[in-house]
């Protein structure tokens, strides 16, 4: 369905921010995920539902429940690649580390660093590595990008981990497409 939609409408939407968690409702939030007292980025969530691949996949799919025209999904690996290619075509440095842009605060507010933004998409150089739907080998899922502790990584970096891993440096980014 996603591929048909992309072909028909000539694209898809990517969340500007990494996924966060509303402390009270446990709902996924994206914009300024930790600015308000009731929201937190996944590093602070201490909640397996949002720190592992399975939990984030399930939560992000519920972001547009009730909307019969739009579907939300965890970002696919090919969508992440498309985002990186789009940025590279617009002269953005994405293929090697740029430590001047790194967001090295694991508890930092999502989207607060003016340097860690490319084409209005935040936190690609730091904060969290991002889970994707992409499979890697038989038992793993791909995670992309850098995190607050990995100054040698870069936005196009591809790694893998078990989907049940609960590393606090992992988050994800949602995509939206039209039905």
Name each region found by the language model.
Residues 1-123:
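Short aromatic-cysteine micro-motif
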Residues 123-124, 169:
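Residue-level recognition of short, solvent-exposed, well-ordered loop/turn junctions
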Residues 80, 136-137:
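Surface-exposed, flexible loop/turn segments at secondary-structure boundaries
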Residues 21, 47-64, 70-71, 75, ...:
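Disulfide-stabilized, aromatic/cysteine-rich ligand-recognition loop
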Residues 125-134:
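Active-site-proximal beta-strands of protease catalytic cores
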């Amino acid at each position: 369905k996603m591929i048909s939609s992309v072909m028909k409408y000539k694209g898809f939407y990517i969340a500007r921010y990494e996924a966060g968690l509303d402390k009270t409702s446990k709902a996924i939030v994206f914009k300024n995920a930790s600015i308000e007292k009731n929201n937190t980025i996944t590093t602070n969530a201490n909640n397996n539902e949002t720190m592992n691949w399975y939990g984030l996949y399930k939560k992000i799919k519920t972001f547009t429940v009730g909307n019969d025209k739009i579907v939300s999904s965890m970002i696919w690996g090919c969508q992440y690649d498309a985002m990186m290619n789009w940025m590279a075509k617009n002269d953005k440095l994405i293929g090697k580390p740029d430590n001047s842009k790194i967001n090295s605060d694991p508890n930092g507010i999502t989207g607060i660093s003016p340097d860690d933004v490319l084409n209005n998409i935040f936190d690609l150089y730091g904060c969290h590595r991002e889970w994707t739907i992409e499979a890697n080998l038989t038992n793993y899922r791909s995670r992309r990008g850098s995190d607050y502790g990995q100054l040698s990584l870069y936005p196009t970096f591809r790694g893998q981990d078990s989907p049940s891993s609960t590393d606090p440096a992992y988050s994800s980014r949602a995509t939206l497409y039209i039905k």
